């Protein structure tokens, strides 16, 4: 029998339950765990910030993984996300990127595949083709601007302690597996689907923990509103471009008018995700095309909604995107792609407690169920034409795909694929790779699709979409807000440029350094800056993004110069693509015929772009790449700070050599591909007469078959060296020109490949900040070289200092031995031969070749220069900067 206290307890419990009433599900339910996979495009940042602003007890962002095969490069992307999370006080969120695993020829998916390539191109390494990614521009409006967020990333975001570190960075697959193993998770895909498709294919036992997948991408019934002609225009006056297309491939709509960038980045991966059996909600172009960043939204944002750091960062990003937009149609062409997707996903999840909400009811988008699929190949199916690695030259299709099935047709091979072009040259392209097509039948999947953005329920508002209001209000909430930006992080922050007073110094030999920003190039730059100015006067640096680092890595050059007190040295940015590799119709894009030889992961771009994880230890320079531009330089309009525009390599050269500058004949030292120098001497015939001599670090001259080159990723090319191979036509242009050339070939570089020899010299004394930094870099390179198979090649970067030391050292101690040879360079479009240097005594161009040098003297000269307190660092590190900015001035 129940006692009186028991009855009272029950009565109290029932009373509380009655008071809670309809809110009971919210009390008892746990938060929605969210995992985001992103390509870190600018609009992805908006979506991530929107999610971070939500109440963590309701929506918990538990992990972020990065798509490394689309709109960003892994090294720049991961550090930007770390900084964004640091601003928002969310250093607890794991970030995954890359991985060194592969897919074997039999279809076995090994652990930690990095997602650097679409699944159809993924082999056992991180080198490969750019079948789909070549549709993304490498420079302005493309990877350069996204990697740097138009220059605002370093200006605005605070820098925390988290960073990419070789062999310690969590991989994309590890973060996905860990987070989904922990419990039911909702996944939001904002970029390509490679990472998540690999997870699904490798971990079917974890599928039950995926509650729902929300996808931004594709176009089902969409009609592209951009590139349309005015209603009253004639054919002679206007030719429509993308107008009415399903997709948004603005660089290749003549081949494929159906696909959208996120799905096009890896159609097969998207197919796997859609057909996984997990419930999918798609927010395609159909819906996002109805919610542009229109002028009223922009002005409302600008005038009334910048009360938090995160809102300011979003607005600054939008503003520079608008100010640098290629035409005057920004307000009709830039949409709320990923942020709208995040909003729709959150609203559906919020309403999911209502069991009757089976049709995805939400506050922001109208929804409809459709039967769709993702097109991965083109009809007719089953015909082998060399375009489809899943089937071509195979007895058994990869992944046991069906012969004659939907994956067995022609697969678009790249830009302007002849099979994809209309036969007459007029009309729409024929390829549909990546098309989210509405179909019926067994291959279709029932997907919940957002069809359009809902209007604002407040008809008196200037903002005519409901999500406009929510987005601005969420970003500006005082809760879950950012702590500081880069400048407010430090109470005594001050931007300061360091320029030496050289008025009383008689300058020495004028030198221009052409670098591709490999680790060896930064070692060389330190050395050049330490040579007395009365011996070497470093006039300019020009960087080549056709080599071992991506264009946004130019910021590391600026930081190093700032450290050494040389903010007076101009830095020019070279062409994004090797000679003759640009697309003739849309030059900002092009293939990767040669640069594909560089790994995208460990020991390649990932490490070069971060200087093996040490770039963030350099002091932060006020100078950096920015997308600021001006009409004077061909931009459609002036931005707010056109004086901050990043100069091009050719412009830096022209400013240096124009009459009145008083510069005598210039010595050029090249440490990378010869793209910049080839363009300089080809664009202006007078340039050659202004060059006294050229020292070229690179090239390989083999006298015996056993004497191999160093293109370790292209087995068919046994005799070329990277700097020549990465732009063979440029190498041919320069080496066969009338220039006075000294070549520092691979064989000579190889003689200086011992990290220990160099470290022994540096260990004895490291009095200067630059010597200490170089020692740390060399110690890290040595450790990686010894520990991991992906780093066995990096000792080749040590030999790159030979050119700088030869130029700035003492011949009496270095004892260089030269020989003359007549050579020619192969540049025929054959990757098995291009970049090879041949001896041709009859028709070859005569150059000098460094055959031998005293290696002990090289090491001693390098170490002693770095340890010399003259021309030493003005500020030693970012840590030193932080202390200065945190201490009141005396």
Curated annotation (Swiss-Prot):
Residues annotated as glycosylated: 55, 232, 371, 485, 580, 655, 740
Gene Ontology CC: one annotated term: apoplast
Phenotype of gene-disrupted mutants: Impaired hydrolysis of inosine and adenosine by apoplastic fluid leading to an increased sensitivity to 2-chloroadenosine. The isolated apoplastic sap extracted from the double mutant missing both NSH3 and ENT3 lacks the ability to catalyze the conversion of inosine in hypoxanthine; this double mutant is unable to grow on medium containing inosine as sole nitrogen source, in addition plants are more sensitive to the necrotrophic fungus Botrytis cinerea BMM but are resistant to the cytotoxic adenosine analog 2-chloro-adenosine (CADO) and to 5-fluoro-uridine.
Catalyzed reaction equations: a purine D-ribonucleoside + H2O = a purine nucleobase + D-ribose; inosine + H2O = hypoxanthine + D-ribose; adenosine + H2O = D-ribose + adenine
Pfam family, one: IU_nuc_hydro
Keyword Transferase: no
UniProt record, GO biological process: adenosine catabolic process; inosine catabolic process; response to jasmonic acid; response to wounding
Signal peptide coordinates: 1-21
Cell compartment(s), UniProt: Secreted, Extracellular space, Apoplast
Induction: By jasmonic acid (JA) and wounding.
Recorded GO MF terms: adenosine nucleosidase activity; inosine nucleosidase activity
Keyword terms: Apoplast, Glycoprotein, Hydrolase, Secreted, Signal
Reported pH dependence: Optimum pH is 4.8.
Domain of life: Eukaryota
Known EC number: 3.2.2.7, 3.2.2.2, 3.2.2.1
Primary role: Extracellular purine-specific hydrolase present in the apoplastic fluid involved in the degradation of extracellular nucleosides, including inosine and adenosine, and which may participate in wound and pathogen responses (e.g. Botrytis cinerea).
Family, similarity comment: Belongs to the IUNH family.
Protein name from the UniProt record: Nucleoside hydrolase 3
């Amino acid at each position: 029998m129940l006692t009186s206290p028991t009855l009272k307890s029950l009565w109290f419990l029932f009373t509380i339950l009655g008071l809670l009433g309809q809110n009971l599900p919210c009390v008892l339910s746990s938060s929605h765990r969210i995992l985001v996979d992103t390509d870190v495009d600018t609009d992805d940042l908006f979506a991530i910030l929107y999610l971070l602003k939500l109440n963590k007890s309701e929506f918990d962002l538990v992990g972020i993984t990065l798509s490394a095969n689309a709109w960003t490069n892994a090294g720049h992307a991961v550090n930007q996300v770390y900084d964004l999370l640091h601003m928002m006080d969310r250093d607890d969120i794991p970030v995954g990127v890359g991985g060194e695993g592969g897919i074997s020829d039999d279809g076995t998916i090994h652990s930690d595949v990095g997602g650097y390539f679409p699944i159809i191109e993924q082999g056992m390494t991180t080198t490969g083709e750019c079948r789909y990614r070549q549709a993304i521009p490498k420079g302005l409006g493309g990877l350069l601007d996204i990697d740097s967020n138009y220059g605002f990333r370093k200006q605005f975001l605070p820098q925390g302690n988290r960073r990419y570190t070789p062999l310690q960075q969590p991989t994309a697959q590890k973060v996905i597996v860990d987070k989904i193993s922990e419990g039911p998770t909702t996944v939001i895909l904002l970029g390509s689907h490679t990472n998540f498709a690999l997870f699904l294919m490798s971990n079917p036992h974890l599928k039950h923990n995926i509650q729902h997948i929300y996808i931004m991408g594709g176009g089902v019934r969409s009609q592209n509103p951009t590139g349309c002609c005015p209603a009253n225009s004639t054919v002679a006056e206007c030719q429509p471009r993308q107008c009415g297309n399903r997709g948004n491939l603005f660089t290749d709509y003549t081949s494929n008018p159906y696909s959208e960038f996120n799905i096009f980045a890896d159609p097969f991966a998207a197919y796997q995700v859609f057909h996984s059996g997990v419930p999918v909600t798609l927010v395609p172009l159909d819906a996002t095309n109805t919610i542009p960043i229109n002028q009223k939204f922009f002005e409302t944002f600008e005038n009334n909604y910048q009360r938090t750091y995160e809102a300011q960062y979003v607005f600054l990003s939008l503003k520079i995107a608008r100010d640098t937009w290629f035409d005057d149609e920004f307000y009709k062409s830039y949409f709320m792609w990923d942020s709208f997707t995040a909003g729709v996903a959150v609203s559906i999840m919020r309403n999911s407690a209502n069991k009757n909400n089976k049709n995805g009811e939400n506050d922001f988008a109208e929804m409809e169920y459709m039967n769709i699929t993702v097109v991965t190949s083109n009809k007719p199916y089953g015909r082998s034409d060399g375009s489809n690695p899943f089937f071509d030259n195979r007895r058994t299709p990869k992944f046991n795909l069906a012969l004659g099935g939907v994956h067995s047709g022609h697969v678009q091979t790249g830009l302007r694929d002849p099979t994809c072009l209309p036969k007459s040259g007029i009309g729409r392209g024929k390829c549909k790779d990546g098309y989210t097509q509405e179909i019926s039948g067994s291959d279709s999947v029932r997907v919940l699709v957002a069809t359009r953005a809902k209007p604002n329920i407040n008809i008196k508002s200037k903002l005519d979409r409901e999500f406009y209001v929510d987005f601005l209000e969420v970003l500006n909430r005082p809760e879950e807000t950012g702590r500081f930006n880069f400048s407010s992080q430090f109470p005594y922050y001050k931007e300061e440029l360091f320029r030496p007073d050289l008025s009383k110094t008689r300058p020495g030999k004028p030198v221009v350094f052409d670098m591709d920003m490999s680790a060896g190039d930064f070692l060389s730059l330190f050395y050049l800056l330490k040579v007395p100015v009365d011996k070497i006067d470093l006039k300019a640096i020009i960087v080549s993004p056709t080599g071992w680092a991506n264009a946004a890595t130019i910021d590391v050059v600026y930081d190093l110069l700032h450290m050494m007190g040389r903010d007076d040295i101009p830095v020019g940015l070279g062409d994004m693509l090797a000679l003759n590799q640009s697309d003739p119709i849309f030059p900002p894009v092009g293939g990767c015929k040669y640069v594909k030889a560089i790994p995208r992961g460990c020991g390649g771009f990932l490490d070069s772009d971060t200087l093996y994880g040490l770039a963030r230890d350099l002091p932060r320079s006020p100078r950096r790449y920015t997308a600021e531009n001006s009409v004077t330089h061909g931009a459609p309009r002036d931005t707010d700070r056109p004086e901050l525009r990043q100069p091009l390599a050719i412009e830096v050269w022209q400013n240096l050599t124009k009459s009145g500058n008083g510069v005598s004949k210039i010595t050029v030292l090249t440490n990378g591909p010869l793209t910049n120098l080839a363009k300089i001497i080809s664009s202006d015939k007078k340039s050659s007469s202004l060059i006294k001599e050229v020292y070229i670090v690179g090239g390989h001259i083999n006298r015996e078959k056993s004497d191999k080159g160093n293109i370790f990723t292209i087995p068919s090319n046994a005799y070329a060296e990277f700097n020549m191979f990465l732009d063979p036509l440029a190498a041919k242009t320069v080496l066969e020109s009338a220039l006075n050339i000294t070549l520092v070939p691979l064989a000579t570089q190889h003689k200086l490949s011992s990290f220990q020899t160099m470290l022994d010299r540096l260990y004895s004394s490291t009095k200067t900040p630059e010597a200490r930094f170089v020692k740390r870099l060399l110690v890290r390179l040595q450790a990686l070289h010894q520990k991991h198979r992906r780093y066995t090649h990096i000792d080749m970067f040590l030999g790159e200092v030979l050119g700088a030391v030869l130029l700035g050292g003492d011949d009496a101690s270095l004892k260089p031995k030269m020989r003359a040879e007549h050579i020619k360079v192969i540049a025929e479009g054959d990757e098995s031969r291009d970049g090879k240097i041949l001896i041709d005594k009859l028709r070859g161009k005569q150059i000098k070749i460094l055959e031998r040098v005293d290696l002990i003297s090289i090491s001693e000269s390098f170490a002693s220069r770095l340890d010399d307190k003259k021309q030493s660092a003005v500020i030693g590190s970012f840590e030193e900067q932080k202390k200065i900015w945190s201490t009141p001035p005396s």
